[in-house]
Amino acid sequence: VLGKFHEISIETADIAASVAFYERLGFSHCGTTDTWPHPYGVMTDGRLYVGLHQFKFPSPTVTYVHPGVAHHSHAIEKHGIEMAWKRVGEDAFNEVGFLDPSGQPVRVQEAPTHFASERERSESSLCGDFAEFSIPAAEFEPMREFWEPLGFVALGETDAPYLRMSMTSDHIDLAVHRPRTLDQPMLVFAAPDMGERIERLRSLDVAMSSDLPRGLDPRHGALLRAPEGTALLLISAVD
């Protein structure tokens, strides 16, 4: 319904600092088009694409690509979704956007703004394998009802490693967590050797946040914060 997952679009006030942070974690650069007039760069671990925009917008945004988005937006609206914005026209880069029940922004644009990476999906970063983009929401059921018609399959709630509900799809997996776990979206990474990875990151002077969700073992879990404020949760396993 939404098209092909493109990137997690993130606002940054200092794109150079953000790029340097993801480089230190082992992410690679992607080539970009000249669509955006503002400074823009894309970092990837082979699975996840992080679009860094030195521009003010609702951030982070889950961004998809679907050709003919001006017309396709009507198909999205048939699911009862009200568009929060529409920028369409012959002289515009067409895009539409809406919010899920938690307020998470989602954008669908007419064409890619970066190229595919040559990096293999198996070439994980120092953070481990990207697992899911997790969204804070007080109630899980409205999120399930919203996202399932858009191509996601919601799994049952689980309390390991914290209370969450996973929603899988062909392109990117989402999840929902309680705001008391962390009151912002998280990029979640998992690896069975996460303890060793965390020690490696510490040796590279990557700072660990003290806001690690309650119940997680700091020997095998860590919370990183990018310069622009993005939360990256590192854990041994998501299930």
Residue ranges and their predicted role:
Residues 34-35, 56, 88-91, 179-181, ...:
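A short beta-turn/loop motif at secondary-structure boundaries
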Residues 4-13, 42, 54-129, 135, 157-158, 164-168, ...:
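Vicinal oxygen chelate
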Residues 1-16, 60-62, 109-145, 150, ...:
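N-terminal beta-strand motif that seeds the catalytic metal site of vicinal oxygen chelate
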Residues 30, 50-52, 72, 154-156, ...:
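Short loop/beta submotifs within extracellular cysteine-rich repeat domains
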Residues 29-31, 50-51, 82-86, 174-175, ...:
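A short linear hydrophobic-aromatic micro-motif
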Residues 2-3, 9-49, 134-172:
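Core segments of cupin and vicinal oxygen chelate
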Residues 51-54, 120-124, 175-179:
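Short, flexible, solvent-exposed loop/turn segments with mixed acidic/basic and small polar residues
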